[in-house]
Amino acid sequence: VDKRVIFAVAGAGKTTYIVNRLSRGKRSLIITYTNANYNNLRKKIIDKFNGEWPENIELMKYFSFLYKFCYRPFLSDRVKAKGIIYEPNSNIYLKESDSEYYITPNRYLYSNRLAKLLIKMQVVDLLKERLIKYFDEFIIDEVQDLAGRDFELLEHLMTVKMDTLFVGDFYQHTYDTSRDGNFYKKLFDNKSSYEKRYVDREIIPDNYTLTKSYRCSPQVCEYVKSNLGIDIGSHRERKSDSTIEL
């Protein structure tokens, strides 16, 4: 079983890397967060397979994965939700043991607490079995955008006995999929402690494969490395007359 998290730099070609490893002989589930990256992945996968979408590959946006793959098979009959609402619960006095903590009065699940509901209802082991049943590898692109309750669920799923690949840029953490008060508030304060969360669950960190950028010039990479402490190189050739204006 190959279990890795690749820490990529900006413009390193992480989407291309993921697509290049896909084949018709392996059942792959790919999860991504933003619409832009979903569309980019979809286009590149179709291009790779000569204009066709291979039946053995499933590409899902994160909340579709949570709702359709994780929630529906195990909890739809018990919870009877109508869908997801993408705004926080305004009632700060509810406890995790209250059903209203997770769902609105008109039966819409709070997106930032759906992952927590799956954990609370003890379906994580069933999710792992479902992943293994339908897929040979589990891939998450933009993994740096999973935070809060969603990262808590990811920590549970990290231990699934199958090939897993997580790819992301720690320093491009932009979105918080499940901001929920102070829960995991300091998750991205320190890269070493963030990386350790993967290591503790036997995920091998890879800080080498995607550390050169196609987007940034050597001069820009040197500036970022010197001033921000980010280990980034460039695939581009140095131009002697290049300057950086600040």
What is each residue range found by the language model?
Residues V1-L246:
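The feature marks helicase ATPase cores and/or their adjacent C-terminal helical subdomains
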